[in-house]
Amino acid sequence: MLTPEIDSLVPHVPFNRRTFIKAAVGSGFAACVMAVSAQTIITDTDGLDAGPVGFKAADGTLIPAYRAQPKGKTNLPVIIVIHEIFGVHEHIADVCRRFAKLGYLAVAPDLYAREGDASKFPSMQQLNDQLVSKVPDDQVLSDIDSTVAWAGEHGGDLHRLGITGFCWGGRITWLYAERNPHLKAAVVWYGRVVGNKTANNPANPLDLAANLKVPVLGLFGKLDQSIPQDSLAQMKQVIATGPEIARGSQFVVYDDAPHAFFADYRPSYRKADAEDGWARTLAWFREHGVSDRAFGKGA
C-alpha cells in the first residue's frame, strides 16, 4: 500500500480505532460510533434475516461473513459487498442491510479470515504491514467465488449478481470484475487502479483492464491523494479498447471529496456526494439487470 493511501485512511479527529473496528458484524458499534459522528447511518433489521454466517472456502477454510436479506424470500438478486481495509465492521454490515431493505441478498465475506483480525492493530502502518500485505489476491478472488456459491445456495439468484467494494475492497472489486463473466455489473468506491506490485499482489487493475468482463461504475474523490487522476484516465483509455460489454463503464469524480467519502462513521464523509453515489449505485445495478425491483418470492 502506498504512503498517501495510508495517510488518507487516518482520521483527522481522535478516536479509538481499535475499539471502533472491534465492533465487527453488529455488536457494540452504535455506542462507540456516535461519539465519532452524529451523521452515522444505522439501518435496523426489521423485516430482514441478518447477521453473521460462515461457509467453507475452496481450501476448506471457514470464512466468516455478514449477510442480510429480506426475511422469508428467495430468488433474490445478489450483491457481494467487499470490505474496506478495516475488515467487516459495522459500517460494512450496515451497507448490507441497506441493500437488503431494497430486496437484495447482500453478503460481505471476511477476506482476512486466514491472516488475522484487523481490530488488533493499533496503527494503519501495522495493519498494512502485518495483515493486509500478507493477503494474496488469488486467495481473495477464490474466496469471493465461494461467497457467490454460498449466496446461490441461500436464496440468491446468481443470474442477477453484482459486486461493490470500498477502499481496499474497491481494488478487489476491479479485479473480480476482470475475472468473473457471470457478474452483471460492479460498482467501485475509491478503489485504486495502480499501486505497488508484490508476490501477493502481482497485478494492478490497470494491467488487466483489457479483460474487464462487466460494466463498472467507478466513484472517486478528486481530493483523494491515494488515487492519481491520471491513473483513472489511463484506466478509461484501456477500457475503451477492451470488450464491448465493458465499454459502458463510467467514472464519476466528486470535486470536493477525499478518500472514503461514503464512510459515514468517519470525518471523511461527504453527505451529498455519498448520497449521490448511492443513488447512482442503485441505478447502475437496475440498469444492468441485477435488480428490476420486481423480485423475490414469498411473503
How should each PLM-predicted stretch be described?
Residues M1-F15:
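N-terminal secretory signal peptides
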Residues F15-F29:
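N-terminal export leaders
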Residues Q39-K71:
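N-terminal cap/lid segment of alpha/beta-hydrolase-fold proteins
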Residues N75-E84:
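Short beta-strand element of the alpha/beta-hydrolase
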Residues P122-T164:
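Gly/Ser-rich "nucleophile elbow"/oxyanion-hole loop immediately N-terminal to the catalytic nucleophile
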Residues S146-L208:
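Primarily recognizes the serine-hydrolase "nucleophile elbow" in alpha/beta-hydrolase
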Residues L212, G218-F220:
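Short beta-strand/loop motif that positions the catalytic acidic residue
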Residues I245-A299:
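C-terminal catalytic histidine-bearing segment of alpha/beta-hydrolase fold enzymes
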